[in-house]
């Protein structure tokens, strides 16, 4: 009989955080486990709230985990508080050719704690009140991470009110293409969502969106 033991990597109240949600998990080329998730500081409610992206790392197959690191935090952009600069719903992937790790998340700016999916607006910039698709990357097996990279202008059209990654994980295809699933809605579709992928054929230097 095989017995499996679950390990609680993050629990409500850890590091004085209200809730942890929306996990994604990958194994790097070196066998390291990397988990990403929403760090929901004050409440378990979805964006727009005070939310950052946390990361946990294990080099022994998940038996032990290093202390949590915050890898995406949009701070008080434009002078607005953290609660109006939340970033959440992460996905993570490993570039199997280079072992570069990419994490994606959606940043929402200035909604004053309104629910993002219903209240974001069309446009391209944070000041437009539209969702921003952000990436970070690690080139040292998840030990350190880049500053956030905004790829909204590469993959979003102006009529879309919200474009965000599909939470969880992305993939590397056999030809080395990096792929994240995405979901979006546009002005003429109201609350109805559509799905597509974003992909990079140059190791993450540029990104493109497929048709729905």
Language model: regions and residue ranges:
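Asp-box/BNR beta-propeller blade signature and adjacent active/binding-site loops
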Residues: 1-212
